[in-house]
């Protein structure tokens, strides 16, 4: 099995890259691709850059040039569930956009025109992730909705609107639904796994800066364990 792994930031891919066996490197379209072996699997590790457009470009290039059997998005997120803490994990069962609004044309809030309202994650990948979490037993883990948008959610009004629009949302980040949309269009199974670097409404900028490496490490450890079971 060939696995594509996408992280937006250096802190989200550094540990994974350090564990790869002599990866070959390709820089293309502002993205970096590292191809090699990790946990016994052929892996293409991708540093996409931040945001929906960067994630879409990276995912499209990854799928077109390397043809992985599945894609896993790793990294950090901001927690929205009241009982989540920094370092806790969220496994997405589906991804939605929180900053898309074409409801004037009869679409759901968050639904892009001519696209589904949500991009479901692959059930088999979810099950593998849950097994790994159960074995680790280190962090609280939830499975549910993660939403994506091109904004860092630190303003009270934006947080309140997101909660009202998506009351079931567990976490928010800036790439996952874009990756999900591209995988949907290419018909490739995918999964988003995120560790919490900050919690909505709780000194988020300072928290993110302090804990992004911790969140990246937790998420990377989870991915390595998953690879051993795929």
From Swiss-Prot:
Enzyme class: hydrolase
Catalytic activity line of the entry: S-adenosyl-L-homocysteine + H2O = S-(5-deoxy-D-ribos-5-yl)-L-homocysteine + adenine; S-methyl-5'-thioadenosine + H2O = 5-(methylsulfanyl)-D-ribose + adenine; 5'-deoxyadenosine + H2O = 5-deoxy-D-ribose + adenine
Pathway the protein takes part in: Amino-acid biosynthesis; L-methionine biosynthesis via salvage pathway; S-methyl-5-thio-alpha-D-ribose 1-phosphate from S-methyl-5'-thioadenosine (hydrolase route): step 1/2
Single GO molecular function: adenosylhomocysteine nucleosidase activity
Record key words, sorted: Amino-acid biosynthesis, Hydrolase, Methionine biosynthesis
UniProt binding sites for substrate: 78, 153, 174-175
InterPro entries, sorted: MTA_SAH_Nsdase (IPR010049), Nucleoside_phosphorylase_d (IPR000845), Nucleoside_phosphorylase_sf (IPR035994)
Assigned protein family: Belongs to the PNP/UDP phosphorylase family. MtnN subfamily.
Name used for this protein in its record: 5'-methylthioadenosine/S-adenosylhomocysteine nucleosidase
Lineage: Bacteria, Pseudomonadati, Pseudomonadota, Gammaproteobacteria, Aeromonadales
């Amino acid at each position: 099995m060939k696995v594509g792994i996408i992280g937006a930031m250096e802190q989200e891919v550094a540990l994974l890259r350090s564990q790869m066996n002599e990866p070959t490197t390709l820089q293309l379209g502002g993205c970096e691709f590292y191809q090699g072996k990790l946990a016994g699997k052929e892996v293409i590790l991708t540093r996409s850059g931040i945001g929906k457009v960067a994630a879409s470009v990276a995912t499209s290039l990854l799928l077109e040039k390397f043809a992985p059997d599945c894609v896993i998005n790793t990294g950090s997120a901001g927690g929205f569930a009241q009982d989540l803490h920094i370092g806790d994990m969220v496994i997405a069962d589906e991804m939605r956009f929180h900053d898309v609004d074409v409801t004037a044309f009869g679409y759901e809030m968050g639904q892009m025109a001519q696209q589904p309202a949500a991009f479901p994650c692959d059930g088999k990948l979810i099950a593998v992730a849950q097994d790994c979490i159960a074995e680790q037993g280190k962090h609280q883990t939830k499975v549910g909705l993660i939403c994506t948008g091109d904004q860092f959610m630190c303003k009270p009004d934006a947080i309140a609107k997101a909660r009202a629009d998506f009351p079931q949302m567990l976490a928010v980040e800036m790439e996952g639904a874009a990756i999900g949309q591209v995988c949907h269009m290419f018909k490739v199974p995918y999964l988003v796994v995120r560790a919490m670097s900050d919690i909505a409404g709780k000194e988020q900028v300072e928290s993110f800066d302090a804990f992004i490496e911790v969140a990246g490490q937790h998420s990377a450890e989870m991915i390595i364990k998953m690879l051993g079971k795929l």
